[in-house]
């Protein structure tokens, strides 16, 4: 897919060996030369251009690490030290501060691909990778690729995120060397290329709105899980760290929509990052709404391990909203449900019932009973009813909920599994072990499928059940363990 017009001319010379960074020639025998990772070899390269390299060896090695072992960048840094006025320590500090956007006026001469030129370090890096030669569409793709995790992601998934009609543009970037790929069609950016793309394209909320919208859509598809959720969360984390926040309302909405999906998988690293980001922006009174501030307090309560502190946070969240409207009824309902759940955990059944029933009544009042938020609310309410010696009511509510989930989503999603687990728990609490086993098996079959690559999550769920009910936990756990080992 390369656009190099002279490639066909070069091939006519019948070369025995052709060195190129521009094309992927599948019809020929090829050998891939990768970056040199040996620090000693790269130090020798530095010494060839910088006469005092031995004197400052430790600093020079840190410079090599900072430019990600890229031979051309190492050579540039060495020549800058030999001919410029910067000391190794000053250059290292500048590199660590600005990385690929180094603004150094010292002119250096270098030969690359047969051409001699003078430029600053910054200009040389950009000349090497030819970012200016990319089409506008390719620059947009590079801009969004900056957020991918270091391990990369499926090219087809990324194409869907950007709503690209074909893989052609990405394939072109792969052939020119800007995008790395593996045999499994995973794409990523070399760290140095990523830094150049960041400094050149300056990704922002506005320019990357398609990507942000796509990630939010996935997070809002309640009951539908994706097997690449960890890479999705890592991408969101990179967005938080790297993107220019030029549209604050849209950015806050992105954070608020991603957090619950992370909570679904207990991805605390990302949840904590979102909370810190929201706290940073919402400390200013001219940014955000009452609902934004209520959500921040609710998110903080989610990660708070002390019940009394979590209760205070939820009460403070409710206090942020003075008037309940159609726009905020869903949020207020969730806050009441969360507060009711905390009161239940902290041994206040009357307050728990009050807030749980308030949350469900708000959903009913504003015609919201069909939405996904009703799932955890009804499940928790059913558990509460069982604890209050009303298990039949709780089981009835959950059976209705199972039917709704199966009708509107499926019977192999995480929501369905959670309801089955809750049913199993209620039957266990009422000493109906055969029914408990049936529902736990249904739940664990789904957990095993969704968490196939993370057996520790299945084990944690099993341990959770054992710890809650030690009197029957070993017996049930052994049955579940036998059941799981028989799954294929």
Residue ranges, per PLM feature:
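A conserved switch/coupling segment of P-loop NTPase cores
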Residues: 1-50
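Amphipathic alpha-helical segments of the small helical/lid subdomains adjacent to P-loop NTPase cores
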Residues: 33-76, 90, 168
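Loop-to-helix "switch" segment enriched in basic
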Residues: 42, 80-138
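C-terminal boundary/linker of central alpha/beta nucleotide-binding cores
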Residues: 75-82, 125-201, 208-213
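A eukaryote-biased feature capturing mid-to-C-terminal, repeat/solenoid-rich segments of large proteins
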Residues: 84-104, 136-139, 198-224, 228
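Extended alpha-helical scaffolding segments used for macromolecular assembly and cargo binding
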Residues: 207-288, 292-294, 309
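Conserved alpha-helical positions within TPR/SEL1-like repeat arrays
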Residues: 256-263, 291-305, 330-345, 356, ...
